[in-house]
Amino acid sequence: MKKFLIALLFAPLVAFANTGTAHIDKWPGSVSDKAALQNGAKLFVNYCMNCHGASYMRYKNLLDLGLTEQQVKENLMFTSDKIGELMRVAARSDEQKLWFGAAPPDLTIIARARGDAGNPAGGADWLYTYLRSFYRDANRPTGWNNLVFENVGMPHILYGLQGQQVMNHETHKLELAVPGSLAPAEFDKSVSDLVSFLVWMAEPQQEYRRTLGWFVLAFLAVLFVVAYALKKEYWKDIH
């Protein structure tokens, strides 16, 4: 609980980190699409968890995505053999500081941290754009830069899927120089699925909360009608 409160305290600092001036695209995904969430979980485990952890999420929570315990153990668990374990990164923080200069942030609530009070869902849009905006930059230590987050220390972990983009300095737009294993539309869909998982992970009960909210509103509406009818019946003899 102490670590979780600290993460919430520092989340706004992550949101205000150095960002570029690129146009932020609208995330086309949804947390109600179980197939997208399952694919996003697979991408997260295979690509993101090499450096980033999700230390406030347990592997058993992935069962809520419609996966069986066997599927989770066989396809999504590489750093632990217990489904009740937290989704921690295998590398130690001191090793990561040595490699990257700073330990990569935990991603459990990154989708919420990247939003803001005026647009809490904006974190999904930012992540969707950021993960598609890496380009080759020989002046950076990793060989990569990002149109959304200038001089970011993170390399392009998905370049095998997307390929290698370069900056056209005349148009200030990115162009695909070396194709990846996925077509551009397929890559965009994969990133959307990954963001779906990140959004779900930041608040796993959001779909239940929304559904429950509609039931509560419906109950209050019925209660209002009953209360109004009772009020009229009670006061008719007085008036």
Q: Which residues are covered by each model-predicted region?
A:
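Sec-dependent N-terminal signal peptides
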Residues: 4-13
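The canonical Cys-X-X-Cys-His
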Residues: 44-55, 194
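Gly/Gly-Pro-rich "capping" loops immediately C-terminal to redox-active cysteine motifs
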Residues: 56-123, 141-170
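Surface-exposed patches in mature extracellular/periplasmic domains of secreted proteins
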Residues: 139-144, 206-211
